[in-house]
């Protein structure tokens, strides 16, 4: 299929720049994936679509405050570092600006010297392997010195960094939030659980590749970025049992779908305890083996994520739903409203 086939017109003012005061006060568009019927609801109405014996699968990754501002020791030049992926030990793959100032062997100091870095290797496109030195626990140092790496389409400063974390975020490692989960509060999850819905967690660390535009004309030629995922034995067994008993598996976010479908596609539709790196690209024509329904935000035109949701329903129904969202002034992208495709 052509990437252009997934384009739609989006007025810039519909791109949500800040989160709503109350996580659950967002709107919810409900789309019947077979008929294309649309209902405009509130996010708290999601409870009425979840039944006893269903599974609600959430991604418990935690966003790192991965943007650091430091000084090049040799010259005093200001350097911005974005952590991308942990390598061996204290070495990280990073994106450095301006990259030309940091060559192999260069050193950078952050804060008052609580964190230092040495460049071990130069990569293309501004990438650098940096080895960090510090006292104490790295993630605690990062919490003190780092900033949240907000998506490029968000221009406003984030007043409360916790609003770019889900309330159940636990596993450090993401460069971006699994944004469908931002709508949930502990109270809403408790009400869902009290209805007999099983709350199950997976982990997928979201990479910055999630914001990278698709730069090919044909979707068949697109290569996905890789992201780390993990499913525990307990979670795998619980989901398998629910499927056998006829319950629905409802994924919260495209990251949860990518985790479950990566594993199910390798094991004849079964889920097993597994961790690794996935480059799964889900687009129309894909047959889902693990997931029945999806809670997700509204995605960018021509993105791999709008291709994924089109695979769960179909392209024409999704684009019709997106056009409806524009007409009804839904809020788009990371801090925007939600959609339930079932």
Swiss-Prot record:
Biological process, per Gene Ontology: queuosine biosynthetic process; tRNA wobble guanine modification
Pfam families listed in its UniProt record: Queuosine_synth
Pathway it works in: tRNA modification; tRNA-queuosine biosynthesis
Primary subcellular site in the record, as a coarse category: cytoplasm
Entry annotated with the keyword Signal: no
Catalytic activity: 7-aminomethyl-7-carbaguanosine(34) in tRNA + S-adenosyl-L-methionine = epoxyqueuosine(34) in tRNA + adenine + L-methionine + 2 H(+)
InterPro entries: QueA (IPR003699), QueA_dom1 (IPR042118), QueA_dom2 (IPR042119), QueA_sf (IPR036100)
Leader peptide range in chain numbering: none
Cellular compartments per GO CC: cytoplasm
EC number: 2.4.99.17
Superkingdom to which the source organism belongs: Bacteria
A GO molecular-function annotation: S-adenosylmethionine:tRNA ribosyltransferase-isomerase activity
SUPFAM superfamilies tied to this protein: QueA-like
Compartment(s) of residence: Cytoplasm
Annotated keywords: Cytoplasm, Queuosine biosynthesis, S-adenosyl-L-methionine, Transferase
Protein family according to the UniProt entry: Belongs to the QueA family.
Subunit and partners: Monomer.
Role description: Transfers and isomerizes the ribose moiety from AdoMet to the 7-aminomethyl group of 7-deazaguanine (preQ1-tRNA) to give epoxyqueuosine (oQ-tRNA).
Protein name in the entry: S-adenosylmethionine:tRNA ribosyltransferase-isomerase
Source lineage: Bacteria, Bacillati, Bacillota, Bacilli, Bacillales
Gene name in the database record: queA
């Amino acid at each position: 299929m052509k990437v252009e086939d997934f384009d739609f017109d989006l007025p810039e003012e519909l791109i949500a720049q800040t989160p709503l005061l109350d996580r659950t006060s967002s709107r919810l568009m409900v789309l019947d994936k077979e008929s294309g019927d649309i209902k405009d609801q509130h996010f708290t109405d999601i409870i009425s679509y979840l039944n006893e014996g269903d599974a609600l699968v959430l991604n418990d990754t935690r966003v790192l405050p991965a943007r650091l501002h430091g000084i090049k020791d040799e010259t005093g030049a200001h350097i911005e570092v974005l952590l991308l992926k942990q390598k061996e030990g204290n070495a990280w793959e990073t994106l450095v600006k301006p990259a030309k100032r940091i060559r192999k062997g260069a050193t950078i100091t952050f804060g008052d010297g609580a964190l230092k870095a040495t460049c071990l290797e130069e990569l293309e496109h501004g990438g650098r392997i940096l080895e960090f030195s510090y006292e104490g626990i790295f993630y605690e140092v990062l919490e003190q010195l780092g900033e949240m790496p907000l998506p490029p389409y968000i221009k406003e400063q984030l007043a409360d960094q916790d609003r770019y974390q889900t309330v159940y975020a636990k596993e450090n490692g993401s460069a971006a939030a699994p944004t469908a989960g931002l709508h949930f509060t502990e109270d809403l999850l408790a009400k869902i659980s009290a209805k007999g819905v099983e709350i199950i967690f997976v982990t997928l660390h979201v990479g910055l590749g999630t914001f990278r535009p698709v730069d090919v004309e044909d979707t068949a030629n697109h290569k996905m970025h890789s992201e780390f995922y993990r499913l525990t034995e307990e979670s795998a067994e619980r989901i398998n049992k629910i499927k056998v008993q006829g319950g629905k598996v409802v994924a919260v976010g495209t990251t949860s779908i990518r985790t479950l479908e990566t594993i199910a596609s390798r094991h004849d539709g079964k889920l097993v305890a597994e961790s690794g790196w996935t480059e799964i690209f889900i687009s129309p024509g894909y047959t889902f083996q693990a997931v029945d329904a999806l809670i997700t935000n509204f995605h960018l035109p021509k993105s791999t994520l709008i291709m994924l949701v089109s695979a769960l329903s179909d392209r024409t129904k999704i684009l019709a739903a997106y056009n409806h969202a524009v007409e009804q002034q839904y809020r788009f992208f990371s801090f925007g409203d939600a959609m339930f495709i079932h």
